[in-house]
Regions:
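N-terminal Sec-pathway targeting helices
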Residues: 2-15
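Short, compositionally stereotyped local motifs that mark structural "simplifiers"
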Residues: 11, 17-18, 30-47, 57, ...
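Solvent-exposed beta-edge/loop recognition patches
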Residues: 25-30, 51-53, 66-68, 75-76, ...
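A structural motif detector for short, solvent-exposed N-terminal "entry" segments of globular domains
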Residues: 27-100, 138-141, 158-163, 186-252, ...
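Second-shell loop/turn segments in exported
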Residues: 69, 219-221, 522-531, 627-628, ...
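Beta-strand signatures of extracellular beta-sandwich domains
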Residues: 96-98, 146, 247-249, 298-300, ...
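Middle-to-C-terminal accessory/interaction subdomains
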Residues: 186, 323, 330, 339-347, ...
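Conserved ATP-binding subdomain of kinase catalytic cores across diverse folds
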Residues: 439, 454-604
Length: 809
């Protein structure tokens, strides 16, 4: 063979080889798990169907199974549901599932899914393929699950999205993933599927959880403990049960939280456990130390290490219960709780709340507003503030609203309790310059009785909305009266509490700009300055915030309040001074926070370790000072004393001080700065009251401050800090600017506010002028310097050292 022929043969061979390689690459490309088809779909979870092998899809999964379904080992494992959407049986021999892109994954055994059938796989990490199926991985937030056919192609994928416990991600008929409060493992994602799943949940022991109530405010009064959460257990056997070996808990990690009493439960008999109630020591009641949460909670009944019954407590409406009915498997919601009696009239679900298809809020320069609603079953509505019932008008066409008012709507459907109430506020042609807050109570009569009583300590279900610059929020909450002296005034302070029983455990919204955006409590506050300058409390706290003081301070915004559609004047929406506020400031768990309201109880740990130690020991001795400084944050104490003295708060003697600490932070006591209506009236006077052994606060906080003034380090830190603030953030100019800014913010609203309560706004104008006079003409800054020099007994050289650059004396 000539060299020319050999070259021709070589070229032909290379061409053939290249063609073969190209064909192989083309064949393998769509099947390679290293680059799954439609991988980007994980950003928007949905089942991804390949061109072939798309007969089986992922139809539902749960990444935080706490009390929905147990595997054969008794564990609450994550799970994944597969659905055969074809018209023929499909063998899973050769199919794989993985939680990593490019991984071959866990191999299915030769199991068959019938046409339109479902297969449940536990993602437990146990790696079992005989009998119950368990993958070799578990589910985690922000990962994606891939289902691979025998050819290696990705037939479906689903992204885990960080759902709450016992909430599944379910694939709807239109291919969208949605969170489901009613999981259906092994059944179709529908009401019928959920009912079938529940009917398959039969009790495994003679002692069962029969009924649970997590928001009991007026249904079951238990004597001394009052109204509290409760759990009813029942003996469903025909023999006696000794309870001493059983425990009840809300935690899988601590099943023995509450041991049942050493007593016997006869056949058909029940026992009620009160949860979260204070122990009166009488031994009369069965008291579990833990309380329950209706938005996301689990309950476990155990014997030894074995869980014999469990319940997932999710989305239980206010004053409703959750439990079982005689002769029925699974769980029901009850509109009429029946502690100690047979459960009846239960429904499997709670209807979903109606949806507003148009905007609610503030509308100016309009003739009317159109309201469009949507919902399952029958939607019924009211316009008079009452909660819709089955006899209320049915929504069949858009509603026209032409004046300020409230629209409420509820869904009614067979097989479910009525939905929670949709509350819509319409503030029409009112012309407000401030943000608008709308507070709507569930029952207007009950609210009126509470507000006008006034009945402090009563909490009623309500809804709160904020409308500001075209945005805002609406959230369910509880409302109660707040404060002491203000309760006899025209505008009363109100506390807002977010709870799962109302439909939302916390409010997540950036109300104040920066800082915490999640709230358990808020205040609607008018204060004692409401008939004078209005701004004193907010002026003091705004100066505190802008000076970056090391105290726990409340943020707030001015607003106009409507209550049940009626104008109620100027208020502030603000944070509440409690453990949740300090937890947000310190970045700790609220349960780790201890708050003590002054005056501290005599003989208490705080009193003995802090107040008594300071009073009984010479704090000029560094060792004693350092010991106290290990317990009390000195910067916080100094800043609190400066702010209280600077603002001349004459109401601090009534106990408007709270100490707070957390072992998750520095463990030291910090000081809360709040309730400042009685400020800016008598300049300089409060330093003597706070920091003199003959002052009004001598009984407690003075006992802490006066001994500290004898310590050179504390004295130097205090006076240096005071001089720094008085020369800048607390200068006369800074205070005057703040007064003018707040007065300008309120000026357009004051006339209507004062007229609403039968007064004239000229008194407000006089009070604003009086504030400016005290600060400017009376030289507020100089009055503070003089007061501090007097209290500390400064010599002329010391006075010059600390205040020389700003001292006009």
């Amino acid at each position: 063979m000539s060299s020319k022929e050999r070259k021709i043969i070589l070229i032909i061979a290379l061409i053939v080889a290249a063609a073969v390689i190209a064909a192989v690459c083309i064949y393998m490309s769509p099947a390679s798990p290293a680059s799954p088809a439609e991988e980007t779909a994980a950003a928007s979870p949905a089942a991804v169907q390949a061109d072939t092998d798309s007969s089986v899809i992922i139809s539902e999964f749960m990444e935080k199974n706490r009390a929905v379904l147990r595997d054969e080992d008794g564990d609450f494992s994550d799970w994944i549901e597969l659905h055969n959407i074809s018209g023929k049986a499909v063998s899973l021999d050769g199919w794989r599932i993985s939680d990593e892109s490019g991984d071959l994954g866990w191999a299915f055994p030769d199991v068959t899914i019938e046409p339109d059938g479902y297969l449940l796989v536990f993602a437990s990490g146990k790696d079992k393929s005989g009998g119950e199926l368990h993958t070799d991985f578990s589910l985690s937030e922000d990962e994606t699950v891939y289902l691979l056919s025998p050819s290696g192609s990705v037939t479906a994928q689903a992204a885990c999205g960080g759902t709450d416990a016992d909430v599944s991600m379910a694939l709807s008929n239109d291919g969208e993933w949605t969170q489901s409060l009613y999981p259906t493992p092994g059944y179709e994602n529908s009401t019928a599927g959920y009912n079938a799943f529940q009917e398959a949940l039969s009790p495994v022991d003679a002692l069962i959880i029969n009924e649970v109530m997590v928001a009991n405010t007026k249904t079951y009064y238990s004597g001394t403990p009052g109204y509290c959460d409760w759990v009813e257990l029942k003996n469903i056997s025909d023999t006696d049960i000794s309870l001493s070996s059983y425990c009840l808990s809300d935690s899988l990690k601590d099943l023995g939280k509450y041991s049942l009493p050493d007593s016997v439960l006869a056949p058909g008999e029940t026992i009620i456990i009160l949860c979260g109630a204070d122990d009166d020591g009488s031994g009369t009641y069965n008291l579990a130390s833990f309380s329950l949460d209706s938005s996301c909670e689990q309950l476990y009944l155990s014997r030894g290490e074995e869980i014999i019954d469990y319940a997932s407590l999710r989305d239980i409406p206010y004053e409703c219960s959750f439990g079982r009915m005689d002769g029925e498997n699974g769980w029901f919601y009850f509109a009429n709780p029946s502690p100690g009696e047979a459960n009846a009239g239960g429904e499997r679900r709670v209807s979903a709340k109606p949806v507003n298809l148009t905007a609610d809020g503030v509308f100016d320069d309009v003739d009317s507003v159109t309201v469009e609603l949507s919902g399952t079953g029958t939607v019924r509505y009211t316009l008079d503030g009452s909660t819709p019932t089955e006899s209320s008008p049915e929504y069949t066409a858009p509603i026209t609203v032409d004046s300020t008012g409230i629209v409420k709507a509820v869904c009614f459907e067979d097989g479910a309790l009525p939905s929670r109430t949709l509350v819509l506020s319409y503030i029409i042609n009112e012309g407000h310059s401030l943000p608008v807050v709308s507070l709507v109570s569930e029952d207007t009569t009950e609210f009126s009785q509470m507000y006008n009583g006034p009945a402090k300590g009563v909490e009623l279900p309500a809804s709160i909305s904020l409308y500001r610059d075209g945005s805002g929020f609406t959230a369910p909450c509880g409302v109660s009266l707040n404060g002491e002296t203000s309760l006899v005034m025209s505008k009363k302070n109100m506390s807002l509490r977010f709870r799962g029983s109302y439909g939302q455990e916390t409010l997540q919204y950036d109300i104040f700009g920066g800082g915490a955006t999640e709230f358990t409590n808020l205040l609607l506050r008018a204060g004692q300055d409401q008939e004078q300058a209005i701004i004193r409390n907010e002026l003091s706290q705004s100066l505190c915030e802008k000076a970056d003081m090391d105290v726990v301070n409340q943020r707030s915004i001015f607003c106009v309040l409507y209550v049940n559609g009626e104008y109620s004047g100027i208020y502030t929406l603000k944070e509440k001074a409690n453990k949740y506020l300090y937890a947000a400031v310190a970045g700790v768990d609220p349960d780790s926070v201890e708050v003590i309201e002054a005056p501290a109880e005599y003989g208490s740990e705080f009193y003995n370790q802090v107040i008594q130690f300071a009073y009984m020991n010479d704090l000029s001795i560094d060792e004693n000072y350092e010991h106290l400084a290990s317990l009390v944050d000195m910067d916080s104490l100094i800043d609190w004393l400066i702010m209280e003295g600077f603002c001349a708060n004459t109401d601090v003697t009534s106990g408007n001080l709270r100490y707070c600490r957390s072992d998750q932070a520095d463990g030291k006591w910090h000081f809360m700065f709040y309730d400042l209506d009685a400020t800016f009236a008598t300049p300089g006077s409060m330093y003597a009251n706070l920091m003199s052994e003959y002052g009004l606060e001598h009984i407690q906080v003075s006992s802490l401050a006066v001994p500290l003034m004898q310590n050179a380090e504390f004295k130097g830190r205090f006076l240096t800090r005071a001089a720094e603030l008085l020369s800048d953030k607390l200068s006369n100019e800074a205070v005057i600017n703040e007064i003018n800014a707040m007065a300008e913010e309120l000026s357009a609203e004051v006339d209507r506010d004062f007229a609403r309560y039968g007064s004239d706004s000229s008194s407000w104008e006089w009070n604003i002028e009086q504030l400016l006079y005290l600060v400017d003409d009376c030289d507020w800054c100089q009055q503070n310097i003089d007061a501090l020099c007097f209290v500390f007994g400064l010599s002329s050289s010391e006075r010059s050292h600390y205040f020389g650059s700003i001292d006009g004396a």
